[in-house]
Amino acid sequence: MKLSAWSKRLLAGVCTAALLAGGASALALSPAALPAPEAISVTNASDAQLRAALSKLAVVYSSDTHGWQVSSPYEDASLSSASCGLYPYLFLSQDDATVSLTLGMSCFSTQKMELQSIRVETKDSTYNFTCDDQYDGGYDADLKSWFDFEFFAMDDHAEYLTEWAAAKSVTATFTGKDGSTKAYTLTKDNLQAIRDIMAAYTTLLDSDAS
């Protein structure tokens, strides 16, 4: 989804200010890729909203992909404890000022499980995801667990994540190609991560020079 040039400058300004102040968690930016602080002194309400949204997230700049990846620290905690999870993240391109919303789904199990499909359920709705043929998993000796990852572009289905964030309970059922299944109820931290990412996503898309 396209961002205005103003929104792009605003994001860069927020990241630069956080870098100088040491305020954003897990912040790793390339200063050379960002404008000088004097050039991005935007101090309106949208600036404050974006600063607040990003302060809860990890913002990492990649010189390889020429952009920023925005993710939740809750995801790192989940992965390090071998917990299943449904965690969205954002990618903000430096080259064409676009923001992309992606959902990463991770499944950990005691036996190898190559995912075929994932069903997500709330009290009122069911959402079905079909996995690709590529196996992105393996065995983690440190965690003593098998895992598989699936990634889905969500720009056209952002409302799914908004609905999950508002639900009292969300359950994901992972189904393997061998017919095995594993159920996972999203934790409080997982739901909060979705809320935090969606708040940043909405703020970025709603930002304008007015």
Regions from the PLM with identified roles:
Residues 1-5:
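N-terminal secretory signal peptides that target proteins for export/translocation
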Residues 8-25:
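Sec-dependent N-terminal signal peptides
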Residues 13, 25-210:
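A generic "folded-domain core" signal
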